Design a protein with these regions (language model features):
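Short secondary-structure transition/capping segments
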Residues: 106-108, 150-151
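Active-site region of the double-stranded beta-helix
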Residues: 1-99, 113-209, 217-218
Length: 224
């Protein structure tokens, strides 16, 4: 990206690369968190906000996520629980997962990865995360991780339900559109042989779940 800049990304010269992509393996439950939108993050953090999506690559039996606030729970309910140091997990929807499930979390939606899950994460290029609950865990010195109660209450939107999709097990077409949201689109490409990707106005990021060869006019590259 530093070398080729806008010729590679299709973005205006000097523009920050807008996405982060990660592989996350969770042995145990991660902290419950929420991210601000661009407007709040700009004012309070001088940074971008964050929306993100998860593609479940592997899930142990019984694995689950925390994904959005339960129906009927209000921001006042959350405020009482958070300021009172109560366990907020009963206020959050727990969703079972399996390999191939896709979850989108817009800014303001509470979420947490459960244990026994390997996932692929696509997100806006931002490190702004507000931790609202960490299950009262302590480190070796008996210290709890810091929480961001007021910031979380500022940005949580209990009405958000996110978007869900599933990677096709037996795709009837080469390209399956999974998500199309303001920050990114997410497609699943499955081909028995060669697949020609249509032209795009900006960059693509290809992540190979199985070995493949990427070919273009000037050469080719093995993805493993």
């Amino acid at each position: 990206i530093e070398r080729y800049g806008s010729r590679l990304t299709g973005l205006p010269e000097g523009a920050e690369f807008p996405l982060l992509l990660k592989l996350l393996a969770a042995r145990g439950s991660l902290s419950v968190q929420v991210h601000p939108d661009d407007e709040y993050a700009k004012v309070h953090e001088n940074k971008l906000g964050k929306t993100e999506a998860w593609v479940i690559l592997h899930a142990e039996e019984g694995a689950s996520l925390l994904y959005g606030i339960r129906e009927g729970v209000t921001i006042d309910d959350l405020r009482r629980a958070l300021t009172g140091g109560e366990d907020v997990e009963p206020l959050i929807q727990r969703v079972p997962v399996k390999a191939g499930d896709v979850f989108y979390m817009p800014a303001g939606m509470v979420h947490a990865i459960g244990g026994g899950i390997l996932l692929y994460e696509i997100q806006q290029s931002s490190d702004v995360t507000y931790r609202l609950w960490d299950f009262n865990r302590v480190n070796a010195r008996g210290e709890k991780r810091p929480l961001h109660i007021q910031q979380s209450l500022d940005v949580i939107r209990p009405e958000l339900k996110g978007l869900r999709a599933h990677m096709p097990e037996h795709p009837a077409q080469e390209i399956t559109h999974l998500l199309d949201v303001p920050a990114f689109t997410l497609d699943c490409v499955a081909a028995d042989g060669a697949c020609i990707l249509p032209a795009a106005e900006t960059f693509r990021v290809l992540t190979a779940l199985e070995p493949l060869t990427l070919r273009w006019l000037e050469g080719e590259m093995e993805l493993k």
